[in-house]
Regions:
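Conserved N-terminal Rossmann-fold NAD(P)-binding element of oxidoreductases
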Residues: 9-10
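Glycine-rich FAD pyrophosphate-binding loop
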Residues: 23-43
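Conserved N-terminal helical subregion
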Residues: 2-6, 23-25, 48, 52-120
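N-terminal Rossmann-fold NAD(P) dinucleotide-binding loop
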Residues: 15-16
Length: 120
C-alpha cells in the first residue's frame, strides 16, 4: 500500500479522530488548525453509542472515564422551572451496559489530541 500524505483541515474532534485512523492505516495525515492552541470550552457531551465503539477500538475508554463528570440525576423541568421528573444516571448507565460518560467537548478533544502521534 502506498503511504499517502493527507491534509486535514481542523484540529477538532473529527480532525484528530481521522488523523488517528489514517496514521493507523499507514498514511501520513497532516492536521492544520486556525487556532494557536486547542480550543477550550464547549458543551457537555453525553458520550455513548457509535462514538463509544470508536473510542473502544482506539483504546481510549480509560482516558474517557478519567475525564467523566458524574451527575446524580437528569432533571426535566417545565417553563416555570418546576421539576417534572428525574432519572438517575446509574439507571441510564446500566441501560447502556456501562458504555456512557458525560464530559466536556474540550476534554474529549484533548483525549483525541493526545492519542494522535505528535509527528502528525
Amino acid at each position: 500500500m502506498n503511504q499517502l500524505k493527507i491534509l486535514i483541515s481542523g484540529g477538532g474532534i473529527a480532525g484528530f479522530t481521522l488523523a488517528y485512523w489514517l496514521h493507523q492505516y499507514g498514511h501520513r495525515p497532516i492536521v492544520i488548525e486556525q487556532a494557536d492552541s486547542l480550543r477550550t470550552g464547549g458543551y457537555m457531551i453525553d458520550f455513548t453509542g457509535t462514538g463509544w465503539d470508536v473510542i473502544e477500538k482506539m483504546g481510549l475508554v480509560t482516558a474517557l472515564r478519567q475525564k467523566a463528570h458524574d451527575f446524580p440525576y437528569l432533571s426535566f423541568e417545565n417553563d416555570k422551572g418546576q421539576t417534572i421528573t428525574k432519572v438517575d444516571f446509574a439507571t441510564i448507565t446500566k441501560a447502556l451496559d456501562d458504555k456512557y460518560v458525560a464530559l466536556l467537548r474540550d476534554e474529549l478533544q484533548e483525549i483525541l489530541y493526545e492519542a494522535v502521534p505528535h509527528e502528525v
